[in-house]
UniProtKB/Swiss-Prot annotation:
Record protein name field: Surfactant protein C
Assigned GO CC terms: extracellular region
Keywords of this entry: Gaseous exchange, Lipoprotein, Palmitate, Secreted, Surface film
Source species, domain of life: Eukaryota
Main location: secreted
Organism encoding this protein: Sus scrofa (Pig)
Amino acid sequence: LRIPCCPVNLKRLLVVVVVVVLVVVVIVGALLMGL
C-alpha cells in the first residue's frame, strides 16, 4: 500500500474518519434508545 501524499492529508483524513464514526455511533445509540 503506497501513500504518495504527505502525512498532513493523512492526518486530516483520519480526523474526518473519526468524526464520521462518532456521528454514526451517536445516531445508532439514539435509535437504540428510541426503540
